[in-house]
């Protein structure tokens, strides 16, 4: 039997950081709260605006993009956190992040001096693993070609 009520436990969790509804529900289930009590606690949190998936999604995108994570991987991670697709798309469109500039910064950090086909493939895989699309990498290759012309 849990020590605190589900609402009190939610307040405790949300006082530390934002959570998605899905994550909160899982935490309450792990603590073995009753299903009705879980539903009541989550409704209470949403009514009082303690928990908001839209706000969580926006802050998650800001935070992870600062770590060099691209839009594709962000979508995947947010889906795993139980955020609905329409919310993810909306927040990615509303964000002021320039994904091409972010890809350039990341690319410059990791780009080796020696440039050959193997290195190009390795960098392409790296950028894909970070969640960037092929169009971002194509943009980087265009910039690379332009910089070689001026050398």
Curated annotation (Swiss-Prot):
Its main location: cytoplasm. It comes from the Bacteria. The keyword DNA-binding does not apply. The keyword Cytoplasm applies. InterPro entries: RecX_HTH_1st (IPR053926), RecX_HTH_2nd (IPR053924), Regulatory_RecX (IPR003783), WH-like_DNA-bd_sf (IPR036388). Belongs to the RecX family. This is Regulatory protein RecX. It comes from Haemophilus ducreyi (strain 35000HP / ATCC 700724). The lineage of its organism: Bacteria, Pseudomonadati, Pseudomonadota, Gammaproteobacteria, Pasteurellales.
